[in-house]
């Protein structure tokens, strides 16, 4: 890195769109998510996607997308971010390039490459995932005239807009659902519950504080539904080992779990495979995974959706309007529809009316602050 701070002339488009609405208003309830929308990327860490046809003379703004480990076509977290920038392109004419680092060390390198680029010159660089925070802290301080946004972490800098989600709140809903259904006789699609076991599971990707929020919320939701339900927990160590996730899920199903919730990114496909093989159920994450992974819709009871797409869309369109909330933290939870539960497309009929009502009630209680969901495992009986 250079010793001196670097600034460069911003090329903000004139005649931009009007200021974007608040995220809560933009959300308007959970949407039906489509496919991954991912492009066919090269293997190089800094490979730029050309699908957006970068032409700064035509685009309202130019955005560089730096995705989390695992890259596009994960049918989960990264693909949700990709849908957001695609929508910004359709609605506001935003141009963008895609970048898929394959290591944590690659994040800062790509961030700096984009920030120093003159062709194209980026109006906004979107950093998807908490592992980008360390690199971005350094990059943002060096390129002080460059605007950034980050998802899932807070970087304290005047040129960074930080979007964070209260995943523990959405995971509480997932746990409440699992805790209620594991005690019932559910037999639909390719799975079934075993009410005599009353055991559920959680599989995380990296054993990190952010993923602990998923586990903590899930455990709290299960306990809220039924304190006698056992929760099995294991961490994969990454977000892309499909076979590893399948093996862990298989052990959990063999140990009596009939529903497994995951926060393991693209590796979650392995959990769905194990659910089909063992005739059990799963709960997806980040996107409606019964839609993004339709071949597993017969075992995906629901998904805990994070509106990463809306965060990216909001940041991109705010950049067009020259009102990016740089230097601020935008926190999204159940109260703003930033997170929530969507039932699976095939298995929605399996959800009893009283269970739906229970989840609707708990959602209102969490949103109102009547139920305070823990963010740490130590507060829920976890490790």
Residue ranges and their predicted role:
Residues 1-146, 150-162, 169, 173, ...:
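Terminal disorder- and signal-encoded targeting elements
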């Amino acid at each position: 890195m250079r010793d001196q701070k670097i600034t460069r002339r911003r090329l903000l488009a004139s005649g931009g769109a009007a200021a974007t609405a608040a995220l809560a208003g933009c959300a308007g309830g959970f949407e039906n998510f489509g496919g991954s929308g991912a492009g066919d990327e090269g293997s190089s860490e800094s490979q730029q996607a050309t699908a957006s046809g970068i032409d700064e003379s035509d685009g309202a703004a130019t955005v560089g997308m730096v995705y989390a480990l695992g890259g596009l076509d994960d049918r989960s977290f990264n693909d949700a971010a990709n849908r957001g920038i695609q929508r910004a392109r359709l609605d506001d004419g935003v141009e963008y390039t895609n970048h898929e680092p394959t290591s944590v060390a690659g994040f800062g390198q790509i961030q700096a490459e984009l920030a120093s680029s003159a062709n194209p010159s980026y109006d906004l660089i979107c950093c998807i995932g908490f592992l980008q925070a360390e690199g971005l802290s350094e990059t943002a301080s060096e390129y002080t005239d460059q605007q950034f946004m980050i998802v899932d972490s807070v970087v304290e800098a005047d040129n960074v807009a930080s979007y964070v989600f209260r995943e523990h709140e959405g995971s509480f809903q997932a746990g409440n659902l699992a805790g209620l259904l594991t005690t019932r006789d559910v037999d639909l699609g390719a799975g079934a519950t075993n009410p005599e076991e009353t055991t559920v599971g959680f599989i995380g990707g990296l054993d990190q504080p952010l993923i602990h929020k998923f586990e903590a919320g899930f455990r709290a939701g299960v306990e809220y539904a039924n304190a006698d339900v056992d929760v099995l927990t294991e961490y994969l160590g990454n977000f892309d080992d499909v076979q590893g996730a399948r093996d862990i899920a298989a052990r959990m199903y063999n140990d009596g779990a009939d529903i497994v919730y995951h926060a393991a990114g693209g590796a979650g496909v392995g959990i769905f495979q194990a659910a089909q093989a063992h005739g059990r159920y799963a709960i997806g994450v980040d996107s409606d995974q019964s839609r993004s992974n339709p071949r597993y819709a017969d075992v995906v009871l629901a998904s805990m959706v994070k509106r990463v797409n809306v965060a990216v869309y909001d940041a991109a369109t705010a950049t067009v309007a020259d009102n990016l909330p740089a230097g601020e933290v935008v926190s999204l939870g159940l109260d703003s529809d930033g997170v929530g539960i969507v039932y699976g497309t095939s298995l929605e009929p399996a959800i009893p009316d009283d269970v739906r009502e229970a989840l609707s009630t708990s959602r209102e209680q969490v949103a109102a602050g009547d139920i305070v969901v823990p963010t740490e495992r130590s507060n829920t009986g976890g490790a």
